[in-house]
């Protein structure tokens, strides 16, 4: 989404992640978040390499690449958790 401030256009991005449904998506800031003064003001104050964890499903940033790194971190964490759980099941003594 493009935020207009004093003639400046800035793209903001959102990272959506849902562990239960194994879903991770990066997209331009959605209209509902863009129209929130609180959200757009908060994001506009972030440094170029910062992220803002809005809740347990959304993280925002000015830089798409920063969100790509965050998405990879989340995926790796989920994989480690799944592997740990799988190993626990494999090691059940019967």
Language-model features: locations:
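Short N-terminal "domain-start" leader segments
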Residues: 1-47
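Short, flexible coil/linker elements and helix-boundary hinge sites characteristic
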Residues: 22, 50-51, 91
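Intrinsically disordered, low-complexity, charged/polar segments
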Residues: 44-81
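Charged, solvent-exposed faces of alpha-helical coiled-coils
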Residues: 78-81, 85-88, 92
